[in-house]
Amino acid sequence: MKRFWLFILPLLALPASSCISVGLDAVSGSTLIWNSGSNNYFNREAYTTLSGPKKLWIDGEVEQPTEVKLSKFPLRTVTVKEATYCKEGDSIAFLGAYRYEGYALCDILSGLKVDKASKEDLWPPIDLYIEIRNQAGDKAVFSWGEIFYSANMYGIVIAKRVTRVIPGKTGELWDLPTEMKLISTTDQISVRNIPSPTHISVHSLRGNYVVNRAPEVLENDPGRLAVQTSFKDTAAVLTELPKDLPVVTYPVLFYGNSTGYKGIREFSGQMLSRVIAPWFPSNDYHTVQTGMLSIAGVDGFRAAFSVSEIVNRNDHKEILLRQDGVSFSIYTACDAFADRSIKGLSEIRLIQTEP
């Protein structure tokens, strides 16, 4: 028996020798460094810790403004390819590919007690959005839906540490950031990745919404969808889908946050990003970074959508604009839940966020 254990113990140790450990993370394994023989291409160097704020101030439509300590939340791992707009050359510059570990907005805001202004006429929180700022005055906006309804629930983080995703053949070492930063993993161009965020404000959509959920309101939908660049400025009124855009079809397991499984459905429509491109182009980077849209139905039901989550996606989970008869609706392929798939659309409006 003694001889058996002398033989088997060295074999048990073999798997551990294929990678180098730097403070093992038993949950994600994200602190492992890649070594020859490992199949994980995201861990080819040790992480670098980023300096930055240790706390966040949260206010707005909340029961009590509060300061939260970031270190109380778990670190979530995300990978992202970052690119930014260069004003000088009117071009896109690739910054690099990185693995970040940071504090997810989903975790930070999960325990927050919201007191939204619209609670009397719209119970779901889908009309909420947040503004994130730093001490330099930079701002980025996110809808409540892309934080809490998204199928990628930990995809927006305040990064605390970083490693490069190093190309195996070229060995290119991208420049590392030096300070903590906001990371949105589904953004094609990284305009919302502002450095060292310190402040979050919670808001709800404002507008002349008339809430009437009676079935006949949707049945008598006139089929007129206003595209508005402000509360007073209507850029277009759609009565049909564009003729020159392709139709996309998604077969889905439809699931509501409140009512659960709704069956297997198939949704066909046009990419909303392309339909609204004449008024909200993806290369209007200031609006992509700070713009929030109200998408509302004739019955007053509405949801907030950041401009970025519609026109600046990199995950190909497009929001579809559909038309059934004369009535417009959207399907949100990016969401785990059906709640923001609004029917009987009457407006897509750019709202005025805080300066």
List PLM regions with ranges.
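Bacterial N-terminal signal peptides
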Residues: 8-15
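N-terminal intrinsically disordered, low-complexity segments enriched in P/E/S/T
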Residues: 20-355
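Positively charged n-region of N-terminal signal peptides that target proteins for export
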Residues: 1-4
